[in-house]
Structures are given as C-alpha cells and as structure tokens.
C-alpha cells in the first residue's frame, strides 16, 4: 500500500491512498477508562504486515476509508478514530496475531447493541487485505454499560419470583420440536411440570406455524402451568416463544402472555435481532415477565476459530441488550463447548466483576457495575448420568434443561421429569455434604436409584450414550 499522492492546490490536501498504520497504529496510546476495547484475531493476506493489518481493522471499523478524503479536515480524527494500540502473536500460529483496538465512546449510540456491532463487526470483516478476522473479546466500559437496562430482572429477582433457592433450576424442551397440535403440546408441558420440573420450553423454531398457532399454544400451556402448580404447590413456568416476523407482532404475543399471568416468555435473540430483543427486554421489565433467550444461529457466527465472533462477545452483548436466561452450551452434551472457555463466559454472564484470565479466554477485566446477571442454560444432549458434572460445572445459578433426556424416558414424560428431579436433588445433597461430584458422581446417581425406580429406568436407557467428538474452537495452546 505505497502512498500515491497528488497535491490539489485549490483545496490544500493530499489526495490518494496512504498506509493505514500512519494514522491508526498507535502503540504509544494509553487506553482510557471510557474506551471500548476489542481483541481481534487477525489473519492478514500474504505480504500485509501485522501493523498495517491491525491498523486497517481499527480504521475500517471506525473513521477510516480506503482513500484520503478532504472532509477529514472538518472533524478531529484524533478524537474519533479507533486505534490499534497493541499487537501480540498467537501461540502456535505463524500467520495470526491478536490486534487490540481502542474505540472512543463518542462513536457509539447510547443503549444500542445494534449500533455498537454495526461499527465493530461491520464491513471490516469483508476487507480484502485480511484472509480472516475474528472478534475474540470486548471490554465494555461502565460509562457505556450504564446506558443499558440489561436483563429485565436478573438472578436474585427470578429466584424470589419462583421461590426456589439452593439448587439449579430444571427445564425441558418439548419434543418433537415441530408437528404437535396445541392441545397435545400442552399435555406434554403438564406432564413434565407435574413430574417435578421448574420449566418447560418452546423449541427455538416454534413460532406460529399451521400445525400450531401461537395463541392456541399459549392458552394450552397456561392451562398446564396452572394445573401443575395447583397439584405440586410449586411455581411453574413455560418459555412461551414470542419471536415473530415483526417487532409489533412479537410485543403482541408478549402482551397476551402477560394477560394470561404466566411468568416467562422467550426470544431467539440472534435471528430476531438486537433491536427487537432490547425492545422485548424493556417490555418484560415493565410488565413483570422473565425473559428466556435462545441463541439459534450462534454457531454460524462463533464456531470457526479464525473468523467471526466468539460467543463470549455475543454473551456480553446479550447481557447489555437484556435477557434473564441464555443457552450457554453444556461441555458434556451434544453441542460444541470447551470447558474453560465455557466457564469463562458463564462468569461473564453471572458475575458483577470478572478479572482478565487468558487461561479461560477472557482478554479484558469486565466491570458490569449494577447490571443484573443472566442465568446460563445448559441444554443439548444431556441426561441423568450428566447431572453430577452439570451440577459441579454450572453450580446453583443455572438452568439444566433436558429435552430428550426427559421425554425419552421409557415410561413417559412425567417419569422422565421425576428421574431428573431425583438425580438433581441427590447431587445437590451430596455436594452439600462435602462429597466430590467430579469423582463420586456416578456412585451418587446409582445410590439415588434405590429410592427412585424412575431414575433407575433412565440410568439403564442412557448408560451407553456419549457425544465424544473433539472441540473445534479450543483456547490457544490447547491443540
């Protein structure tokens, strides 16, 4: 990218192309407390130096363009430009490096994840000088965090609403995910809640299809909730998916859920979009509804190690946009999820203050100030034999969600729910007594089988089920 300039005497500036690093690579820059900081994994095209590639990322995601423009003289680039302030190698990767970029806060609209992402992960990801680009992490400064409402309620408020303490919450996704009539769907919801689960859930692609329109589903699920509550004395819920083709229709569905008196609704936040999600989160806080978030489409964005965006960034964005639960992988189930990386973004979802810890993929210290936390949801290919590991990995402030692991029980839906509840209670009691779930987990489950034929049957059915595939997106240095 050699400079090619000609002087326009009538204007008094040099037109043409100049190297990005001359303006946007500033290793001497000291970051401000108000800057949004980004860590990018950069794979430049052959012949493009790291400093030029890192500067190009900073430029194209902030104030820069491919050529010099005379209107640069009408503003202060020093005030508004992004800056690549540090570059470090990636262990074991000769062609990759991490570029750290600082963005001034004035570049972003207050309270808008949509605007933040449009800049930081916008056109720059198609830049020809880069073979691949991945956003690994963001530091959201408190000054920007305070412009967001965040989760509608948060962990403590949810526990108080449900009157459930001292253990993970239990859920189940109703299967088959598509094709049931509303009445049969409601029957499955009732059986699972009656058997001991706290929640049941619409699958992410259940919206309002010809076989089951949303209003019918909402009505039969509400009936199931009230009937199971009356019979068990426990507060129950079903994640009613309000995701729709327009924001207006989505809010209409949430309004109907509130009128039914149910405790929680659901949204597919990536396919629905951050603008829609933030709008729904505001409605939920104003109207006392909890909000469950599904991350459908996330693997399109986050699964490949060299290009896209890590889920820890999507998790931070969700905490800003708003949600009380979000799916976060399982580590032990059928879906992708490295253990240390998963534990890292689980902390980013739940905790108020998280220290930088590269061993868990956390590039920046994050202070959420007063923003409520989000419950991570473990879901996907899990069953009763996984209960000790899930309890040990995710702890009490989580939702453990068994779809096939409930509805696949040989005796039916309610016995499947009983099996999961007994296994969970046994694991929590054993942990509270000081037993090591990681070492004694299988023994703890077997002991509980003596008191629960439903659990014994579940253990027999799923004793050989494994999902032993290598993790694709491992932390650096784990290959």
UniProtKB/Swiss-Prot annotation:
Q: Which InterPro entries would you find in this protein's record? A: RuBisCO, RuBisCo_large_chain_AS, RuBisCO_lsu_C, RuBisCO_lsu_C_sf, RuBisCO_lsu_fd_N, RuBisCO_lsu_N_sf, RuBisCO_lsuI
What residues sit in the active site? 175, 294
UniProt main location, coarse: plastid
Cofactor(s) for this protein? Mg(2+)
Cite the PANTHER family for this sequence: RIBULOSE BISPHOSPHATE CARBOXYLASE (PTHR42704), RIBULOSE BISPHOSPHATE CARBOXYLASE LARGE CHAIN (PTHR42704:SF16)
Q: Does the keyword Lipid metabolism apply?
A: no
Q: Where in the cell is it found?
A: Plastid, Chloroplast
Q: What Pfam families does the database record attribute to this sequence?
A: RuBisCO_large (PF00016), RuBisCO_large_N (PF02788)
Locate the residues binding substrate: 123, 173, 177, 295, 327, 379
Superkingdom = Eukaryota
User: What family classification does the UniProt entry report for this protein?
Assistant: Belongs to the RuBisCO large chain family. Type I subfamily.
Further facts:
The basic functional RuBisCO is composed of a large chain homodimer in a 'head-to-tail' conformation. In form I RuBisCO this homodimer is arranged in a barrel-like tetramer with the small subunits forming a tetrameric 'cap' on each end of the 'barrel'.
Protein's name in the database: Ribulose bisphosphate carboxylase large chain
- This chain's source organism reads Lobularia maritima (Sweet alyssum)
Under the heading NCBIfam families, the entry gives: PRK04208.1
Q: Extract one GO BP annotation from the record.
A: photorespiration
Q: Give the function comment from the record.
A: RuBisCO catalyzes two reactions: the carboxylation of D-ribulose 1,5-bisphosphate, the primary event in carbon dioxide fixation, as well as the oxidative fragmentation of the pentose substrate in the photorespiration process. Both reactions occur simultaneously and in competition at the same active site.
Please report the PTM annotation for this entry: The disulfide bond which can form in the large chain dimeric partners within the hexadecamer appears to be associated with oxidative stress and protein turnover.
Q: Which GO terms describe its molecular function?
A: magnesium ion binding; monooxygenase activity; ribulose-bisphosphate carboxylase activity
